Amino acid sequence: MLYHGVDLVEVARIRHAVVRYGQRFVQRVYTATEQADCLAGSGDVRYEALAARWAAKEACAKALGIGLRGLGALAVADRPRAGFHEIEVVRDNDGRPVLRLSGFAAEQAAALGICALAVSLSHTDELALASVVAWAG
């Protein structure tokens, strides 16, 4: 069985949240590893990288059939949700993005019999996209 999730986010939306809420937003949504991956060599924030990781978290949640806690009006009130840190985008030894699940997200993946996840990230200056495919078998 295959499960798929895709998400598209405007980079400006993430930039606005970072500018408005600062580290409070960044720490709430992104793990320390994700934060480090989204800093340019100069230490400047790469908003498109943050947006791509946001999209990956959303796409993964869609593939798992769950929502993310903290999305306010976008979340369905009675639907179980995973925390932002429970879906983490890390890099493998070759630099490719991979997903690391924990907590409720990992429990849901196990309940669906998911044995592998693949994530693809892409972005322009304005938009970030993520696609997640989950294999159960």
Curated annotation (Swiss-Prot):
Mg(2+) binds at D7, E58. Its cofactor is Mg(2+). GO terms for cellular component: cytoplasm. GO terms for molecular function: holo-[acyl-carrier-protein] synthase activity; magnesium ion binding. Keywords: Cytoplasm, Fatty acid biosynthesis, Fatty acid metabolism, Lipid biosynthesis, Lipid metabolism, Magnesium, Metal-binding, Transferase. Its EC number is 2.7.8.7. SUPFAM superfamilies: 4'-phosphopantetheinyl transferase. It catalyses: apo-[ACP] + CoA = holo-[ACP] + adenosine 3',5'-bisphosphate + H(+). Its main location: cytoplasm. One of its GO terms (biological process) is fatty acid biosynthetic process. It comes from the Bacteria. The keyword Metal-binding applies. InterPro entries: 4-PPantetheinyl_Trfase_dom, 4-PPantetheinyl_Trfase_dom_sf, ACPS, Ppantetheine-prot_Trfase_dom. It is found in: Cytoplasm. Transfers the 4'-phosphopantetheine moiety from coenzyme A to a Ser of acyl-carrier-protein. Belongs to the P-Pant transferase superfamily. AcpS family. This is Holo-[acyl-carrier-protein] synthase.
